Amino acid sequence: LLRGRLSGTFEYYIQKTTDLLQSVSLPSTSGVSSYMANVGKTENKGFEFTLNGTILDNHNGWTWEASLNLSANRNKLTELASGSNDDKANNWFVGPPIDCSYDYEKVGLWNSDDPDFQYLDILEPGGNEGMIKVKYTGDRDASGKPTRAIGPEDRQIISLEPKFQGGFSTRVAYKGFDLNVITAFRCGGKLISTLHHSNGYLNMLTGRRGQVDVDYWTPENKGAKYPKPGGIQSGDNPKYGSTLGYFDSSYWKVRNITLGYNFEKQAWLTRMGIQSLRAYLSVQNPFIICSPFHKETGLDPETNSYGNENVAVTEGIQKRFLTVGTNSPSTRNYLFGINLTF
């Protein structure tokens, strides 16, 4: 299009997988942690889109090119080999994505001005103001009173998949100089922070760990994110502490910036027998443009290891889940280089 200055591709796919091989978790009493088995069938649907454009083509010495790529994938588990509709021990449910979490859904903290606070003793026996409030899915009587306490049946299927993801890159050149910028983005989905999860360190608000500086609930700070220290405990953590580990995984980051200069047709190069010389300076992962997770924690939101690859995580996170936090983060690297052609 536009005399070759605009081009692109679009691909749509449907992929069906049978006899899917996965690691199946076993109870600790079995003596074996897991085994490999064909667990069922999955289906992936999605698209991949690319658009390349030349905005300036040697206009007064200026060249400007840009490229956009976009992709989206929808995964679902269509069948379990056992014939059942779910395997809750392994977080497998027919219909949702195979990599989904099965956990309580945090809706806030309990406060005295909450309409349900009058039912706190029913929903959370022994509970207190300032503790984590999770979604209740049970029945209520005619007056709106809950019929039972919150329990395992209130856990939700939480999809970790993004709505879409992709990248944008651009190149600007002028009289031997060139600047390349590569960015990546992700919209929607959830990431799991091992620092904030139930096996992390930022929600253990007991003992000496109560000295961690987080935004926790007090009578003067009822809009806090973290619960009141000293409430109902689940091990070393506040009850429902795992819900603090889920974050919006959206981000837009600069992945690479490279500035270079090409020494061409230089007499001193010819005398040295050098046909061409290029010098460049590059930086990887220089900064995050926007990210809810980065704004709160200062960490890079790009997940880079699975639960079973993270030595700081011993339980509570499925091995196939991408995590960020106590693993090795994306690093910022600076590189200077010279390319010579003789």
Q: What are these regions, as identified by a protein language model?
A:
Residues 8-14, 66-72, 172, 181-185, ...:
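Transmembrane beta-barrel strands of outer-membrane/channel proteins
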Residues 186-278, 282-284:
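Extracytoplasmic gating/loop element in the C-terminal half of outer-membrane beta-barrel translocons
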Residues 45-51, 64-66, 164-170, 177, ...:
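Hydrophobic, lipid-facing positions within transmembrane beta-strands of outer-membrane proteins
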Residues 39-46, 90-115, 216-222, 239, ...:
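C-terminal beta-signal and terminal closure region of outer-membrane beta-barrel proteins
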Residues 12-18, 32-33, 41-47, 70-76, ...:
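Transmembrane beta-barrel architecture of outer-membrane proteins
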Residues 1-31, 64, 71, 75:
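Membrane-embedded beta-barrel scaffold of Gram-negative outer-membrane proteins
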